[in-house]
Amino acid sequence: MASDMNRRKFLGYAAASAGAVTIVPRHVLGGAGYVAPSEKITVANIGCGTQGLTEMFGMLTAPEVQVVAVCDPNQDSSDYVEWGKDSVRSTIAAGLGRPQWRKGAGRVPGGRDVGKEVVELYYSDKAPSGGYRGCASYADFRDLLENAKDIDAVKVMTP
């Protein structure tokens, strides 16, 4: 049985294989200053109103946490209680690093669509691709607990 493999081809294949390993992005492997995706705590946030949205940034900014789902019976509302003039919207906008976020809407935003928007905007800005669409949303917490199988923890922010 003849083989077409010679020393030169073998070294070429070996070098190509070694090079492929070195192009794996650092954020995938983890290490000092990086948390590998497999090591992150996946969290669902139940409650996307005034308190829930402003509290969410504690989780979003933690490198060892990944918010993967939000839940609120309201889909998208603008009738939440305001603590001070434009305080909730401006807190969310500052957390996102987008001062113009929903500026001029005149009302306090909230609901699961707003929660999902906040999570995806925050992670999009941090993603190498510039996009992130990995946050599920649920109207009922029972559906979340039944269907979201990749959740390690749940944070409940409801009245």
Give a label for each model feature.
Residues 2-159:
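N-terminal glycine-/serine-/threonine-rich beta1-alpha1-beta2 phosphate-ribose binding loop
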